């Protein structure tokens, strides 16, 4: 596994290792974060489409792309939705160290809060980010502790910390951590059960993948992709002779309002999983991803 960037001229080498190499895909990281950030989501669906299907623009095969949201460097997932700015004072470098372009969003308060509305919005975004990662083609990498809300108090460069700031507290408990772990476990169970979500070759033909408008269930055209305000769509991944099992449709709404939903094709669909409550075969909640599987 390569971390395909380094200092200096020609240091960035994403997609150039080839062969049996897999590579951390930072374009996926930034594209996924932008989807759910209020200041960066305009045009984000168009930019993310290739990344969601395994980054064919960068890799010969989708399994060469190691998709991730967070890593050993940078914010934890909990901190990504809780801090607008890095807080690295404990590192002794006057907060000059660490990455500045984090695409993080605190949802209205910097750091921990007791505001139930802010907490609910953060949890909503965390679940949407996790489904963005786990439902994408490629190899998902989940940072240890993100599945239970691990925080480093806004420190995004904790390599020099060996104490409570960076340690994982495996004894910690609470409804929020337990519910998040259960959500991740449920998603991984579905991944194992639905081969169409784990494909080894890129999807190029309409028989494999198709994109649809959510409001009327009509297949997307060039004008839809050229709309800079596009904030919702669905993608159908079809099973076939080499990929048995149910087909799936993944519906995304990165906008601030619920949308009517009409699912594509002649299939009968059932909701398998959603990042937000209130999703049905006819309703796509705001800021959410829904996963449907075919019953045919």
Predicted features by range, described:
Residues 1-144, 148-149, 157-161, 250:
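Conserved alpha/beta catalytic core and glycan-binding cleft of carbohydrate-active enzymes
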Residues 15, 113, 118-123, 127, ...:
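Carbohydrate-interacting/catalytic domains
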């Amino acid at each position: 596994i390569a971390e395909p960037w380094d200092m200096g001229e020609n240091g960035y080498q994403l997609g150039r290792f080839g062969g049996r190499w897999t590579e951390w895909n930072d374009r996926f990281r930034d594209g996924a974060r932008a989807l759910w950030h209020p200041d960066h989501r305009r045009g984000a669906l168009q930019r993310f489409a290739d990344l969601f299907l395994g980054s064919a623009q960068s890799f010969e095969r989708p399994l060469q792309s190691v998709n991730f949201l967070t890593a050993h460097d940078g914010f934890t997932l909990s901190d990504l939705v809780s801090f607008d700015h890095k807080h690295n004072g404990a590192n002794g470098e006057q907060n000059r160290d660490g990455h500045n372009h984090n695409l993080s969003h605190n949802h209205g308060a910097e750091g921990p809060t007791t505001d139930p509305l802010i907490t609910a919005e953060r949890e909503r975004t965390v679940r949407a980010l996790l489904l963005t990662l786990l439902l994408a083609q490629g190899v998902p990498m989940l940072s240890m502790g993100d599945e239970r809300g691990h925080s480093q108090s806004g420190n995004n460069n904790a390599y020099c910390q060996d104490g409570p700031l960076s340690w994982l507290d495996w004894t910690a408990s609470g409804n929020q951590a337990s519910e998040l772990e259960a959500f991740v476990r449920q998603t991984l169970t579905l991944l194992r059960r639905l081969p169409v979500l784990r494909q080894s070759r890129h999807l190029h033909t309409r028989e494999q993948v198709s994109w649809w408008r959510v409001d009327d269930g009509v297949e997307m055209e060039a004008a839809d992709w050229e709309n800079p305000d596009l904030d919702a769509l669905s993608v159908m991944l079809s099973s076939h002779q080499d990929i048995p099992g149910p087909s799936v449709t993944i519906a995304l709404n990165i906008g601030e309002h619920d949308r009517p939903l009409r699912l594509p094709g002649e299939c009968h669909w059932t909701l398998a999983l959603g990042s937000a409550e209130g999703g049905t075969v006819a309703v796509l909640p705001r800021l959410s991803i829904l996963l449907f599987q075919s019953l045919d």
